[in-house]
């Protein structure tokens, strides 16, 4: 049962009763629990977003209802917890973040399952991944050591590695990351991979020390929108030749490779990097690594103008068994730059058009060269 005070707040907030307020009202609004961030609390019933002052639903600092609940629980704001649940927030998210026994009891009274802390954590993590709820996940797990410690250490890392390889997560880390950083980078990577603009902007604002890492991750995942934004709007600059190896390591990463090339990276060096990766050394022996996605990157570098006719590259290409057409093209001396890629363009939408056209004509282009040569 909700108190008259909570129900009154609900009606007043939904009707935007505090949209025009005087400075003298601030203290009263704060004491009544009607202040959120830097202004009176607001709520959009259509978007299910909690706002502050004149903030719009699309503002980077606006909160989805479940995130607002998590924040209120962490601050033990009893009336707001009740209010957010009344609007439809999932109280099970709240019990995970309760720091006091009193708040935990309140969450249970509002409908939280007390067994959730024992049996629901794993499924919650997986569900958040499926729904790409990056900011909610970070609000729940980041800096919530008591919850992170409920995960068995081995199971916790296996869970994350099962979905994404840890290469990009451990980028530039000289020692094992603490769980907080591990979780943060994991969810940040999801935001970049799926180009979730609001989470990316929110996280980049909150964690500016990860700017270089963010740019590298965007290159690795081929997110040209984020590369362009970081490089030209935020002036986060790294040497294109340092970024290119990251682009090359992600299978079929034409967007990332092209963008580094357009920024000035040496495409011959990129091809050499790929060949070294294919011929990686294990226990003193050269092990031939055959992966279609990596070979796709090799072919793309050649299409961008890399020279495939050096001794080391020749030896590797002749060992290629899966891509027969590429091997045949090499033997006939027909691996060459693709005419559509001769321009260096940096506008993301135009880059996507070029790559789309290239992918449409790539196989036809190769077969045409081979057909003409065999006549």
Swiss-Prot record:
Record GO biological process: taxis
Coiled-coil ranges from the UniProt annotation: none
Domain of life, per lineage: Viruses
Family statement: Belongs to the asfivirus MGF 360 family.
Function: Plays a role in virus cell tropism, and may be required for efficient virus replication in macrophages.
Protein name: Protein MGF 360-4L
Natural source organism: African swine fever virus (isolate Tick/South Africa/Pretoriuskop Pr4/1996) (ASFV)
């Amino acid at each position: 049962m909700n108190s008259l005070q909570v129900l009154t707040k609900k009606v007043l907030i939904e009707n935007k009763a505090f949209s025009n307020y005087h400075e003298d009202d601030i203290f009263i609004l704060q004491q009544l629990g009607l202040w959120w961030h830097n202004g009176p609390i607001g709520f959009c019933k259509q978007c299910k977003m909690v706002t502050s002052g004149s903030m719009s639903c699309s503002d980077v600092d606006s909160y989805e209802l479940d995130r607002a609940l998590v924040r209120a629980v962490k601050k033990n704001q009893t009336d707001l917890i009740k209010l957010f649940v009344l609007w439809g927030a999932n109280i099970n998210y709240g019990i995970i973040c309760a720091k006091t026994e009193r708040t935990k009891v309140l969450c249970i009274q509002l409908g939280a399952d007390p067994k959730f802390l024992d049996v629901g954590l794993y499924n919650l993590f997986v569900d958040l991944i499926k729904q790409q709820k990056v900011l909610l996940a970070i609000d729940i797990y980041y800096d919530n050591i008591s919850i992170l410690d409920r995960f068995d250490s081995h199971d916790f890392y296996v869970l994350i590695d099962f979905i994404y390889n840890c290469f990009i997560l451990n980028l530039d880390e000289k020692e094992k990351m603490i769980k907080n950083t591990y979780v943060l980078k994991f969810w940040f990577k999801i935001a970049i991979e799926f180009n979730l603009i609001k989470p990316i902007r929110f996280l980049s604002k909150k964690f500016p020390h990860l700017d270089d890492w963010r740019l590298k991750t965007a290159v690795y995942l081929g997110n040209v929108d984020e590369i362009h934004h970081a490089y030209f709007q935020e002036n986060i600059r790294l040497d294109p030749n340092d970024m290119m190896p990251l682009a090359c390591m992600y299978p079929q990463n034409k967007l990332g490779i092209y963008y580094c090339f357009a920024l000035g990276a040496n495409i011959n060096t990129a091809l050499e990097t790929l060949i070294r990766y294919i011929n990686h050394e294990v226990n003193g022996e050269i092990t031939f690594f055959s992966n279609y996605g990596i070979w796709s990157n090799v072919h793309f570098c050649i299409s961008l103008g890399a020279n495939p006719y050096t001794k080391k590259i020749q030896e590797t290409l002749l060992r290629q068994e899966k891509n027969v057409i590429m091997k045949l093209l090499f033997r006939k001396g027909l691996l060459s730059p693709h005419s559509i890629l001769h321009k260096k363009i940096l506008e993301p939408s135009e880059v996507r058009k070029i790559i789309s056209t290239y992918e449409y004509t790539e196989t036809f282009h190769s077969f045409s060269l081979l057909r003409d040569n065999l006549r």
